């Protein structure tokens, strides 16, 4: 079982990243909340990992924080929630925000994540309520994301942001609208920050 990787970040195109660990390249999938915390290319990073093994597929997922990995592992135990949807959920809001939605029975916020309908959101709240009852929540409202790192050139900022949103499950036309709206709010934003703004606007936080 691979539980932690320390290496040089050599590629990142949400939701995928590539880590060079002693000459071996590890491809991982990660939620946007992890991408927000990544250093620029060529720098060292430590990621907490989860290896998902099925009959035909081995997937490695990376997380900047142990609590994000912990919540990911809790999410995939919910009936109907696989790794892809768990990544989408963790991309839409911080772990503490998800726990807060469960605590407050905030179905509406959860349904804004692509792939989560009313029934799935209700199931998440029901099944996670006991599992997250000891989650240490900070005081206050929905959390703000951390500092954002720039990853794209000026020519492909919008394209990268749209591609990332599409990979998270949004339709191309919706992704384009979300990026355009985010760009109006902050014209100088880089791709990762555009994604952050778009996702937070959709979640209403």
Swiss-Prot record:
What GO molecular functions are on record for this protein? Answer: ATP binding; four-way junction DNA binding; four-way junction helicase activity
Q: Name one GO biological process term.
A: DNA recombination
This protein's UniProt keywords? Cytoplasm, DNA damage, DNA recombination, DNA repair, DNA-binding
Q: Which cysteines are joined by disulfide bonds?
A: none
Q: Where is this region: Domain II?
A: 65-143
**Where is the region Domain III?**
153-205
- Tell me which GO cellular component terms the UniProt record holds: cytoplasm; Holliday junction helicase complex; Holliday junction resolvase complex
Subcellular localization: Cytoplasm
Q: Name one Pfam family in it.
A: HHH_5
Domain notes for this protein: Has three domains with a flexible linker between the domains II and III and assumes an 'L' shape. Domain III is highly mobile and contacts RuvB.
What is the purpose of this protein?
Answer: The RuvA-RuvB-RuvC complex processes Holliday junction (HJ) DNA during genetic recombination and DNA repair, while the RuvA-RuvB complex plays an important role in the rescue of blocked DNA replication forks via replication fork reversal (RFR). RuvA specifically binds to HJ cruciform DNA, conferring on it an open structure. The RuvB hexamer acts as an ATP-dependent pump, pulling dsDNA into and through the RuvAB complex. HJ branch migration allows RuvC to scan DNA until it finds its consensus sequence, where it cleaves and resolves the cruciform DNA.
**Matching NCBIfam families, A to Z?**
ruvA (TIGR00084)
Q: What is this protein called?
A: Holliday junction branch migration complex subunit RuvA
* Taxonomic source organism: Cellvibrio japonicus (strain Ueda107) (Pseudomonas fluorescens subsp. cellulosa)
